[in-house]
Curated annotation (Swiss-Prot):
The record's free-text note on cofactor binding: Binds 1 dipyrromethane group covalently.
Pathway assigned in UniProt: Porphyrin-containing compound metabolism; protoporphyrin-IX biosynthesis; coproporphyrinogen-III from 5-aminolevulinate: step 2/4
Protein name, entry field: Porphobilinogen deaminase
Enzyme class: transferase
E.C. no: 2.5.1.61
Functional description taken from the UniProt entry: Tetrapolymerization of the monopyrrole PBG into the hydroxymethylbilane pre-uroporphyrinogen in several discrete steps.
Assembly with partners or alone: Monomer.
Organism field: Bordetella pertussis (strain Tohama I / ATCC BAA-589 / NCTC 13251)
Length: 314
């Protein structure tokens, strides 16, 4: 296979997205010094629509379409995504070619005045961008007011600093990647806020026909992370996972096994269905599918029927 002399990485324009793309660029440059690796910065529809929640404007695919167009028309050879933003069903001619080692998958509590969610007084406003976080906060802290929070990381922090919210909840990985870990007042353990499928991981998307790019990316992948996110995304895929569904799935490697936890919640937090499964890590897909079936059998189907036009069958 002929050596690739030049690679172009498609990326969103936010500071966090650029950090992620630059991280992949630097890894590729270090491994393939003879290859020129550059960035193509694009603005996605998801970056432009900031006055409505993702659940109301089309969901996660809003962050990838423009990048996929660049792959199709040859302007880019690969696209770097936060994996939790990548739809679980990637259709031909696209493929998720590589998943890098995961950063911290937890959610982070950020506030200028309070140390944790438990410290917030009744009626305090908590900002979050996802129904998943909202439902879990409402379930544990029904006295708090959860308000939507859109925009890039700097915009969200600015809204907190302007007094729009008493606290906000964000992905810890994004704060840490941008050197903002000092803003974190508390990390929310999975018992308090189960993460989204793929949270903290970076995924690289290519065209299925680019065997040359796939071969170059292979050494960058992390097998343990891939197993975990495969199980998580299997749950989401079987349940029609999207921004319209308060769905969480988090897997970790425990010795030779993969341990998976998942939940589906009503947006108001009054109903939460949970499932746990574990098994050999090479059975990640099956573990995720089993957990999804458990959720459906235990009542998630009723929640999904209220949220989705066509809900999955058990």
């Amino acid at each position: 296979m002929a050596a690739v002399e030049r690679l172009t990485i498609a990326t969103r324009a936010s500071r966090l997205a650029l950090w992620q793309a630059e991280h992949v660029r630097d890894l590729l440059r270090a491994r393939y010094p003879a290859c020129s690796v550059e960035l193509l910065t694009l603005t996605t529809r998801g970056d432009q629509i900031l006055d409505r929640t993702l659940s109301k404007v089309g969901g996660k695919g809003l962050f990838v379409k423009e990048l996929e167009t660049a792959l199709l028309d040859g302007r880019a050879d690969l696209a770097v995504h936060s994996l939790k933003d990548v739809p679980v069903d990637l259709h031909a001619p696209f493929e998720l070619s590589c998943v890098l080692e995961r950063a911290d998958p937890r959610d982070a509590f950020v506030s200028n005045d309070y140390g944790s969610l438990a410290d917030l007084p009744p009626g305090a406003a908590v900002g979050t961008s996802s129904l998943r976080r909202e439902s879990q906060i409402r379930a544990r802290y029904p006295h708090l007011v959860v308000k939507p929070l859109r925009g890039n990381l700097d915009t969200r922090l600015g809204k907190l600093d302007n007094g729009d919210y008493a606290a906000i909840v964000l992905a810890a990985a994004g704060l840490e990647r941008l050197g903002l870990a000092a803003r974190i007042r508390a990390l929310l353990e999975p018992d308090d806020s189960l993460p989204a499928a793929g949270q903290g991981a970076l995924g690289i998307e290519i065209l299925q026909g680019r065997a040359d790019v796939r071969a170059m990316l292979a050494p960058l992948g992390d097998a343990a992370t891939l197993a975990c996110v495969t199980a998580e995304r299997a749950v989401s895929r079987m349940l029609g996972g999207s921004c319209q569904v308060p769905l969480a799935a988090y897997a970790r490697i425990d010795g030779d096994e993969l341990a998976l936890r998942a939940l589906v919640a009503a947006p108001d937090g009054r109903r939460i269905v949970r499932a746990e499964r574990r098994g050999p890590r090479d059975q990640a897909q099956a573990i995720g599918e089993s957990a999804a079936r458990d959720l459906l059998a235990d009542g998630a189907d009723a929640i999904l029927a209220e949220l989705l036009p066509t809900s999955p069958a058990p």
